[in-house]
Regions:
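Bulky hydrophobic/aromatic packing residues
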Residues: 8, 67, 169, 239-240
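Phosphate-binding loop of NTP-binding sites
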Residues: 96-234, 238
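Short, basic phosphate-binding NTP loop
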Residues: 7-119, 128-139, 154, 161
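Short, Lys/Arg-enriched N-terminal segments with co-localized hydrophobic residues
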Residues: 1-5
Length: 240
């Protein structure tokens, strides 16, 4: 389906996230993973469940239940006793999610068929622009874009893990709530085209000045693939 990633073996995933694969008794032949989720309710046949400890909910609590939904593995930061699925143990599951997404995009690029990543950042208008881009690009080929405003170190990888061999365009919304965040996101998913919208004062508290914000936004341009294209807002003194 359109929501699947590039198919990967558990060994390949463990290598991509630099994790330790604990097969346990659950390893029957070599299951192939075709999707990855952090929300246990979205798990389907062939999914990898990435357990993330949030403020209210710890994904590790759900690891024993995802096997019944068809999960082929769980990525965890500690071994779960009654997991029922193979586990890939890593130090940080959020970083592992990013590493898996990065590997998925590299796998897609390695096919050599046309594939373009459009990265969008700015304080104002990201989601509207993303929705317009998706509407336009969908006429030209299968397009993956975030649902809602998935633009952080969890949302961007989850969106990127919906890219597969059929995908022609990935619209990647990149939030910038602190200096270095966009550089981190572009290291996971280097854009071919970077769009920098208005740099507003929405996040001045954390950044300190419009110049600092502009610097953060410029990280998306430095994160471009070689020969990439940047689209700037000529009306914004902090961008152009």
């Amino acid at each position: 389906s359109s929501l699947t990633m590039m198919p990967m073996s558990l060994e390949e995933i463990a290598q991509a996230v630099q994790g330790r694969l604990i097969a346990g008794t659950a390893a029957v032949n070599t299951p192939v993973a075709t999707s990855a989720f952090t929300d246990s309710r979205q798990i389907v046949e062939g999914s990898v469940f990435v357990a993330i400890a949030g403020e209210r909910v710890d994904g590790h609590d759900y690891v024993p239940h995802v096997g019944a939904q068809g999960a082929v593995a769980a990525i965890v930061d500690h071994e779960i006793a009654d997991a029922g699925v193979p586990q890939i143990v890593v130090e940080d599951t959020v970083l592992a999610l990013g590493a898996l997404a990065k590997h998925n995009i590299e796998r897609r690029r390695a096919l050599g068929t046309p594939f373009t990543v459009v990265g969008i950042t700015g304080s104002v208008g990201k989601t509207t622009t993303k929705d317009l881009m998706k509407a336009l690009l969908s006429h030209m080929g299968p397009t993956v874009a975030p649902v809602g405003s998935f633009n952080n170190e969890i949302g961007l990888p989850l969106t990127s893990l919906k890219v597969n061999a059929e995908t022609r365009f990935l619209v990647a919304e990149m939030g910038a709530n602190h200096v270095g965040e966009i550089a981190n996101l572009t290291s996971l998913v280097p854009p071919d085209i970077a769009v920098v919208l208005k740099v507003g004062v929405a996040h001045l508290g954390e950044f300190g000045s419009a110049e600092r914000i502009a610097q953060a936004k410029s990280e998306i341009i430095h994160g471009l693939v070689p020969g990439g294209l940047s689209v700037l807002n000529a009306n914004d003194e902090h961008v152009a």
